[in-house]
Structures are given as C-alpha cells and as structure tokens.
C-alpha cells in the first residue's frame, strides 16, 4: 500500500474517533447558570434543562454510575454548582442542612426524582398490555351481592374461580387491541384497572370486597393479582435506546390524535425487543415523498392527482423522499412483553401515532 493511501486511512480513523468523542460530549445550553438552588417540585430532568441542550443526559452531568440503584440524591435547598473536570461539565452539590430555631438538624424534604412521578403513578398501577388469549382465560366477575349493575368501593363481588382468602386482586376491563405498524403482528390487548379488592371467602365462586375504584365494576370484567409495589420503579436512569429496528408510536394512552409534552404513549416494542424502563428515544415523522410531475415540478402528497399517486408507487425515478422531521423525545417508564409506555419529555412538534422512534442523536455511539 502506498504512503498517500496510508495517510488517507489514518485520517479517516482520526475523523471517526473524533466523531465518537463529539457525540459523547455534553453540550451546555446557551446562557446556562453557574449554579442553581434546588426547589421543591423540581426533577433531575428539569434541573438539567437549565444547563444542558439535551437534559435527558443528566446522569452524565452528575457523573453517575448506572449500576448503582440511587446514584445521586439531591434535596430542596441544595446548591448545585457547575464545574469542569477534565474538560467535561459536572454538577457538584453543596447540601443544605435544615435547622430548627434551637439549632437542631431537621429531616429533609423528599429527594428530587428523575421525572415527576405524579404524572405516571396511575399508569404504573392501572395499565397493562397482556396476551389476548391469556386475558380471555382470566377469572371473570359474575355479579355481586347487591342487585346493582355497577359495583363500587365496599361492595362484594362474585368471581368465577377458587381464590385464596386474603389475596389482593385487580379487576380489569378489556381495552384496545394492538397490532404492529408494519407486519400487523398481534401485540396484545390493553387491560384497564377498574377496581381493586381482597378475597374474603373462597369457593368455586369466591367473594371479593372492593377496596378502591377507578371506574365502575361490571359483570364480565376479569381479575388478576395486583402487586402495586413491584410495579413502582424507585428510580429512572435515562439512557439511549438502541434497537435493531425502529420502534413506532402505537397509540395515545388518552386516545388523542396528537400528543405533546408530558402525554403518555404506547410504543410497539417491549422487553423481548430489548426495551427497558429509562430508555430514551428521539421521535421523528417520516419524510413525505415528493413526486416530480410531467412539467418537472415537485408535487406534495396532498396535491397529487390520481395519476401522480400511481406514478410515485411504481417508479422511484419520479419520487423523492424528504428527510424525516424531528418531533421530540420520549422516555420509557413501563415495559410489557411486546409493547411499552413512554412519557413525551420534549416536543418541538405534535407527536402522532405511527411516528418513528430512533436512537437519540447525541448517543449514537457507546459511552
């Protein structure tokens, strides 16, 4: 190999290495403060938004170890100061010590969470996506001691199964059935929690007393064990998702046509695809195909004639795909087998069903 070729290869390797370093470097927000005093109601994401262009990368700003369950706890009143360590921005904490008028140390308010758990607590407990056939085989509510069609807190309902006295169950109604965007694969059925109750009498038909209601409970709904504590993650460590194939927005939890910041969405990938709680995706709208008509002019999809639509589908020579359009960021907070639920943390444009979910640009390479 001649010397110029060697130099060219070496230059290419240097450029690749530099691009890795660039992608891994935190970008500070223009006009960021040098320090910040934590306030009650803040989240780690909110605080990082004062300093970072990509606030979801707050673990790197704190220099946390992702293997530690609670790598960093900060509290209202703590002062955060921006410093640079080996050229990288970091936040260091000066703890605030609360004292009583007598000078005694007082207990701190609760630690600041990664995201506002109040936004997702109900979804963590109430929503599941399960196998359709499995759901249909669950024990069924037959009715109740009262002759009412609807049952509320304090009522006793009858379950078509022998259950263990003292066990706690959730009552679920069947919601939407989900299929994948491209293959039409069955992804499961939405199970919506209507009530919770405890078994008070066992038999071929068991009795359950309702302890809480989210919706009115009716005959035909299904019951399954509810384990509220196991469904509540103590900590979300945001990190880049990196799947083999793009995910898609499957549905809006509230069945909205368009979603914005802090709305909850279902996506069409789950644990079997490698999705985990804390995974962050960039959201994109597919770029449209522009057709070049007989006059050599570009025609958008909503302006095409029937002929131009057919032409675009049979000949790529007359169709040009526009770039995908960035919509925002989504963080997964609950994972099922084939689907997951995520919170839209950033949105620059409205998010819709079928929007594409990709690895965030800032972390296309491993840290």
Positions of the model-derived regions?
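Hydrophobic helical h-region of N-terminal Sec-dependent signal peptides
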Residues: 10-14
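Surface-exposed, polar/charged interaction patches used for macromolecular assembly or partner binding
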Residues: 8-9, 22-367
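Positively charged n-region of N-terminal signal peptides that target proteins for export
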Residues: 1-8
